[in-house]
């Protein structure tokens, strides 16, 4: 049965470049969409630039151009980057569109008519220097729940909590740095708390198409935490309005009031699809009416789960539309075990990757080989990237065609033999359903492992039958024809399995194989005596220099203040730090559960620490000062809790930094904590 499916990726914001972190999500989505299309389903992939809000307005002002001109330029750049990585959108649109304005206003009116909108006079933070009300993302401060520093005014990127900017501790304006003032303003609220019963049912429910949950298990657990237990709910009503000046859509019958960007951004999915429907004649209502029998899936990052699993389904349902079939979240991208860094050159933009001449399918394959259906971070290990691409794609896959095609062309007029009874091909075809299920469930890593295991079987067959030797032997033409025909058919099957991940290679292979296109049917069907064309090289190896040049091209000089050592006993005091700099550091008391020496290191000690709210492992280079590390067990220490995780060579990942004092003789001493302090207590 042919399925009707609408798929989206989260909308990239229109004030920055596309980087490999964005690409993780769009590759994940594109692979899934291409798989559905290969299976013959009616599947549409829509996305758009997220264009509204104060950041865009201020960025355009800084450039001296109109916001409309800036977002048009950025959209063109974004689309070029995604197209360069073979992301096959059916439509890539903009949230600043007539369709999006209409849908946003219609949904607002429907929610209002349904009693889900109310106006309130609120106290809002106002920047006295810039004379403007501050949007949530332009207020920063300390999270009121987990006390992480330097968090935005609408949600915490550490614990995921959403809140009002007035709830921030020690807030400051991200525009001017000034301490904001509270002033009154009328705002409009979506009464999300009244939607709790629906959301509890939807988040814990299954979709009717295949019985699978709407959310991943990790996401559902988070929703239960946010929704509360029983009849109680912790959901807060959602402020959906912002004051002028603001770049966005004005709220109907409310001059000077604009829709908050997070209201019209997901509506952009509808707008992009509607634009596509109008162009090619699709029935839009069939996909968005309340009783729709079609499927709709959103692929997103874990940091925007709250918006997509709570606000968005509630907005849709209570405005008379269908809710999503599934919301699939993924983790963040790290590079070599660490957060992407501009100074290290690992904050890699899509444009630089393409401009350096690297094959985008190398990255598509590597990212897909790391992805599964869970909400887990993905690490791009650059050495592993080189070795895996060269081993799997060049060594195992494309070489199969290269080793057989020449004999077919020269000895058999480019026409393979009918080998439909081949045991080798039967083995490959037998995995079609299993690999299809893995793609369907977004278990790409498992799918690609199984595909490469099949490639290993084919290469073992090559080594066992040695076509290059058969070609030299008298009377072995028929056997040579049979072996090479099996290899060409095996290559075709492997290409079909890999086509969702390697669309350009599959298209090039289709030309070589003299096929209109590769489809999923090619995982089971043989070519028969179908004539093929002359083989053309399909993929080059990754060279170390290419990766080195890529990293160098992405390095940005970041000036850091260094404190030169003054002659004598003490180091010179470092350059003055402002209050805001200090507030970025989140220091906590932690209890040492276990401390031990690190095998293979003369400097490191491994600390198992209890922070109260969670347990972590931190490595510290103080082994010389504590020859008996077990004596530290049970001790309280002070640690930087929001220090970016660091990969410590072969020893593991360090999840923070323990504070110590450097004595005049060069030894490091842990800082003492007074009696009564508990794990998790803030220091400052």
Swiss-Prot record:
The principal location of this protein is cytoplasm
Q: Which residues bind ATP?
A: 342
Q: Which GO terms describe its biological process?
A: methionyl-tRNA aminoacylation
Q: Which reaction does it catalyse?
A: tRNA(Met) + L-methionine + ATP = L-methionyl-tRNA(Met) + AMP + diphosphate
* Cellular component annotations (GO), alphabetically ordered: cytosol
State the source organism's domain of life: Bacteria
Q: What is its EC number?
A: 6.1.1.10
How is its cofactor bound, per UniProt? Answer: Binds 1 zinc ion per subunit.
Against SUPFAM superfamilies, the record matches this protein to: Anticodon-binding domain of a subclass of class I aminoacyl-tRNA synthetases (SSF47323), Methionyl-tRNA synthetase (MetRS), Zn-domain (SSF57770), Nucleic acid-binding proteins (SSF50249), Nucleotidylyl transferase (SSF52374)
Compartments in which it is found = Cytoplasm
Q: Which cofactor does it need?
A: Zn(2+)
Q: Where does Zn(2+) bind?
A: 143, 146, 156, 159
Q: Main EC class of this protein? A: ligase
Q: Where is this motif: 'KMSKS' region?
A: 339-343
User: Is the keyword Zinc assigned to this protein?
Assistant: yes
User: Which family does the record claim for this protein?
Assistant: Belongs to the class-I aminoacyl-tRNA synthetase family. MetG type 1 subfamily.
The UniProt entry, under NCBIfam families, shows: metG (TIGR00398), metG_C_term (TIGR00399), PRK00133.1 (NF001100)
Family matches, as PANTHER family: METHIONINE--TRNA LIGASE, METHIONINE--TRNA LIGASE, CYTOPLASMIC
Q: What is this protein called?
A: Methionine--tRNA ligase
Q: Which organism is it from?
A: Neisseria gonorrhoeae (strain ATCC 700825 / FA 1090)
